[in-house]
Amino acid sequence: STAGKVIKCKAAVLWEANKPFSLEEVEVAPPKAHEVRIKIVATGICRSDDHVVTGALAMPFPVILGHEAAGVVESVGEKVTLLKPGDAVIPLFVPQCGECRSCLSTKGNLCIKNDLSSSPTGLMADGTTRFTCKGKAIHHFIGTSTFTEYTVVHETAAAKIDSAAPLEKVCLIGCGFSTGYGAVLQTAKVEPGSTCAVFGLGGVGLSVVMGCKAAGASRIIAIDINKDKFAKAKELGATECVNPKDFKKPIHEVLTEMTGKGVDYSFEVIGRIETMTEALASCHYNYGVSVIVGVPPAAQKISFDPMLIFSGRTWKGSVFGGWKSKDAVPKLVADYMKKKFVLDPLITHTLPFTKINEGFDLLRTGKSIRTVLVL
């Protein structure tokens, strides 16, 4: 048995920004109290991982990225009660401690134990790391770090799921799908018959489209500058697709003309401040709701006309789709098993873990929606 011992395994280490991932042998320490060590089976490539590579999201280096995954518990530290070796799990970049004000509130989901701040530590709760490589300490990423054969997470940052679930599919419930789907159902609470606009048609944006359809929206306007994304958006429920490049005027004016007075709900699923204000301006001046789903770039500030808000609009943010992670993830997996939603259309590529750099190239060139790496 490997329990209680250091495991040597393969991991993709990012030594510095704007460099390819380096496949290295790393040492993964055993889990401490309240921690679990997980054998990662499948992990998705999300734009937020790439934001660290480009420097748009500030993280301490060197680091093992990856946060959208599924795996099996290899061993548990002392005092762990809810998980045991052999359990199928999804790591949670938004943990659920069950004790902080966000966890205790019916309205909240962003647990205080998260490492998503503008100055992340990249460390476990005790201020240390479980990864070393070539004698150097390697940082964790938002409490998950899934671009490795083995990782260690806090027990509040792993959800036990149905062991029959296909891990190479449900790994998307660890981020992309849940983030988009929940932004509609949990954060915006879209009503039947509504008109919605979705800015950005990557994996998360398409999950927003699916959420709008599930909520009964009558018009779902999908917006992207890459027209190759439109067929998939329509397949998943978009009623119209708009390419801002086809117009001389700002996209919020186009949407206002298309809908009369603006959409009921808009979703920014890109992470650009320009599209955040466009999305806000495109919703109804008095009762429109706009939700920021894309991770905002580090150190950039928004300036906008406050009259956009004064007239009655609501501007909201949504992290992990507003779901209380440990409670919701097992239910979302169960819903997937009951065929209440699909994940296959989001997964355009499945690659062996060693081809991680190729997977990121597919993302950057707009050729993929989700690439799943199989370990």
UniProtKB/Swiss-Prot annotation:
Subcellular location: Cytoplasm
Enzyme Commission (EC) number: 1.1.1.1
Binding site for Zn(2+) 1: C46, H67, C175
GO cellular component, one term: cytosol
Major subcellular site: cytoplasm
A Gene Ontology biological process term: retinol metabolic process
Alphabetized UniProt keyword annotations: Acetylation, Cytoplasm, Metal-binding, NAD, Oxidoreductase, Zinc
Superkingdom as given in the UniProt entry: Eukaryota
Residues where N-acetylserine is found: S1
Cofactor binding description: Binds 2 Zn(2+) ions per subunit.
Molecular-function annotations in GO: all-trans-retinol dehydrogenase (NAD+) activity; zinc ion binding
Reactions catalysed, as given in the entry: a primary alcohol + NAD(+) = an aldehyde + NADH + H(+); a secondary alcohol + NAD(+) = a ketone + NADH + H(+)
SMART domains associated with the record: PKS_ER
InterPro entries for the chain: ADH-like_C, ADH-like_N, ADH_Zn_CS, GroES-like_sf, NAD(P)-bd_dom_sf, PKS_ER
EC category name: oxidoreductase
Chain segments annotated as transmembrane: none
Similarity comment: Belongs to the zinc-containing alcohol dehydrogenase family. Class-I subfamily.
Entry protein name: Alcohol dehydrogenase 1
Organism: Coturnix japonica
